[in-house]
Design a protein with these regions (language model features):
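Conserved helicase motor core of SF1/SF2 NTP-dependent helicases
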Residues: 96-98, 107-112, 117, 177-180, ...
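ASCE P-loop NTPase motor cores of helicases and related translocases
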Residues: 1-178, 296-315
């Protein structure tokens, strides 16, 4: 069963903070989410397009995220647009700046998939960092991250059940339950203090939520309390979140759906739309783009070289 206690504590903490903090300076990323505000980017006037189309697209993406100023950003991409790769590349660049990074998603499978790409880029660039993957003890290792360096002396990402966190750790990967705020364990007089799970309360610089279209709004808020900046990665046109009940108003939406408000693509001044797919042939891409992505999705040059041989000579 899905454990809700930490998520309830997190939402309760946010509500109390919002009501009692007159400055509203804490949890700015979550505030931006619920108010559906424009991203706050350093050195960029609010309302301006986030990406300069005349410059290198990947470099522009990295620059925008680096300059995120206690705010929220959406990276939307159709299948084959490189959501995982660009997210991992951005994360590596942030780690190089000594930023504390979080990685989350609805499932451990999605988290591990992004971690594999992060590990691959770090090895290619010969960049070392220390990361942990927090798993449930009940999973008995089934959710563990298994990468190229796992179990070796050069291990980059260590699996843990969440009851210890190295001080020099720069990347933490976990589901909403682990990131959700929980009060520190109380000290009992005469007893040895217990070391509980790490308390994440804005001690991370960034959290990247992959497949954000599957993470409900409440969980997105709970995760957001752990960080100064929140990046939602996904595509509402792909798999939606699993729904087990009926929720009033916007409560049943994912964080991504809540921000897009029935728009097919994220506006130029609100987020980053990954415009090139390496998966779809031009004719197929044109149809998909016009039907679902406001004609913004284009086929990459590499797709021109692909052919599908159906071997239909006898038909």
């Amino acid at each position: 069963p899905y454990r809700k206690d930490n998520l309830v504590l997190a939402i309760d903490k946010y509500i109390n903070s919002f009501l009692n903090d007159k400055t509203k300076n804490k949890y700015k990323a979550v505030n931006s989410l619920l108010k559906n505000e424009l991203p706050d980017i350093k050195n960029l006037e609010k309302g301006k397009n986030l990406i300069d189309e005349k410059k290198d697209f990947n470099e522009e993406c990295i620059k925008v995220v680096k300059n995120l100023n206690s705010s929220l950003l959406v990276i939307q991409g159709a299948p084959g647009t490189g959501k995982t790769w660009i997210s991992a590349k951005i994360i590596i660049e942030l780690l190089k700046q000594n930023k504390k990074i979080g990685v989350s998603s609805l499932s451990h499978k999605a988290i591990n998939n992004l971690l594999l790409q992060i590990e691959e880029i770090s090895l290619k660039e010969k960049f070392k960092f220390k990361g942990i993957k927090i798993n449930s003890a009940e999973s008995e290792g089934r959710d563990n991250f298994e990468g190229k360096t796992s179990g070796t002396e050069k291990e980059l990402i260590i699996n843990t059940t969440g009851h210890s966190m190295p001080e020099d750790c720069s990347l933490v990967a976990a589901t909403a339950y682990a990131f959700a705020y929980r009060p520190p364990l109380p000290k009992v007089k005469g007893e040895k203090s217990k070391k509980g799970p790490p308390v994440f309360d804005q001690n991370l610089d960034y959290i990247f939520i992959d497949e954000a279209g599957q993470v409900n709004l409440a969980s997105t808020i709970a995760i957001g309390l752990a960080t100064k900046n929140l990046v939602l990665i996904g595509d509402q046109m792909q798999l939606a979140q699993p729904i087990k009940g009926t929720h009033a108003g916007n409560a049943g939406k994912s964080g991504l759906e809540f921000l897009l408000k029935n728009q097919d693509t994220i506006p130029y001044n609100r987020g980053i739309f990954l415009k090139e797919t390496r998966r779809l042939d031009k004719k197929i891409c044109d149809f998909i783009s016009e039907s679902f992505y406001e004609s913004r999705l284009k086929p990459h040059e590499i797709t021109k070289k692909r052919k599908v041989n159906l071997n239909l000579k006898n038909f």
